Amino acid sequence: MTLHEYIEDMRGKRIAIIGIGVSNTPLLELLLAEGIRVTACDKRSREQMGEQAEHLEQLGCELHLGADYLKDLDADVIFRTPGLRPDVPEISACVQKGAVLTSEMEVFFRICPCPIIAVTGSDGKTTTTTIIAELLKKAGKRVWVGGNIGHPLLCEADGMLSTDFAVLELSSFQLMTMTQSPHIAVVTNLAPNHLDVHRDMAEYVAAKENIFTHQSREDIAIFNVDNAITAEQSTRAPGHARLFSRQGEVADGVFLRGEDVVCRSGGHERIVMTTRDIKLPGVHNVENYMAAIAAVDGLVSDQVIRTFAREFGGVEHRIELVRTYKGVRYYNDSIASSPSRAIAGLRSFSEKVIMIAGGYDKHIPFDVLGPEIVAHVKLLVLCGATADKIRAAVENASGYRPGHPEIIDAAPLAAAVQAARDRAQPGDVVTLSPACASFDQFKNFAERGDFFKAIVNGWEE
């Protein structure tokens, strides 16, 4: 099915699009331009939407806004925004009456004419997705990047060729209702996350599994065998399972032997590069490269991989060196919105650091973070709703002694950054590594990271 054919199939149907955000707006405008009747529902008020509300109404859109935006929902086809649970009562009632519940990403999977490579996991998704996409580009492939990064691809599907590649980063929210899987799936790792939205860890893991559950026998799924959850998942993949490991050799996939990154396939193995070739810091980035190599094996030459690894400096907000100020290095790791991500960042430094942590409470445990802070942090500056939980995790950790690390509270984030600056000495490292989401103070992790960078870059020498 092509995009044009899908649009024709929508004619005469009542369409509801829930959430007028980044992923749904291009679809909404496309349908309206085609003369299709669309109702757009958004919990924001008309005042909060500003000129966008008037613009959509001028295009012929019916708007349901504000607290009761789902009241009287009635449609033949409902497009769900990724952040909204599919089982809210209003949607469930509509589905029971025969409505089709879908999403921009689900439709893209139906109509995409080229192979899809998709990445999910708790940590490393964006970096791994970016590495895969950039390697394919360096190898001369035409690549479309979307999902959680890039931009919505559905409206561009008719411009794609069968020889292109679509490379996607997919979240658990996007995957919850997926009934199709990509040609190549990558699961970087799984750890507790987003338990403020998912009922429990089991539902979170089940959502992630949709990235490979619907694959055919000819498709490929790549798993981190060092992670207990993803290692178990690899035994249930319907397609060809490939593994990657930093801790031991694998029969089919990519692994570390000393400093050598080795790819093994069909009984043959080769050294693709060494860990010294990887410019990005941290063992977690070695894992990201191993996952990416397994995904592009046979599509990209080893020379291209080595050259890229030596040059690629990483993705913004991921252990990003902001500035060295008066002998102190300041890093922006705002993407570290969970304990596991924060741990990976802390382990990338050779010295004990000054850590700024805390934020929105996603109802995930911090027990695993406590010992890592004890081992890697000299001063912990806490702010945000989770400050007390993180403090308790550190103080209850094995090996903790009062003052090791020292823990102080400073809120909001601007005050925490100032406190870190006041205490830092030449040679120190200060890292914004929140271990939490940003929604208590910021729109998202990027806005939080930009705020941090603006403060640090604004200091006069």
Predicted region positions:
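N-terminal leader/targeting and accessory segments in enzymes
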Residues: 1-103, 301
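Nucleotide phosphate-binding/pyrophosphate-handling subdomain across enzymes
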Residues: 3-14, 24-34, 142, 273-378
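Residue-level signal for inorganic ion chemistry
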Residues: 31, 78, 119, 148, ...
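Short internal beta-strands
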Residues: 37-44, 221-225, 356-357, 376-385
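Short beta-strand "acidic-cap" motif of Rossmann-like dinucleotide-binding folds
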Residues: 38-42, 145, 167, 243, ...
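Beta-strand->loop->alpha-helix junctions that form or flank phosphate-binding loops
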Residues: 39-43, 64-67, 102-106, 238-256, ...
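C-terminal helical cap/extension that packs against the catalytic core
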Residues: 53-54, 368-427
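Phosphate-binding loop of NTP-binding sites
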Residues: 70-75, 82-225, 229-240, 255, ...
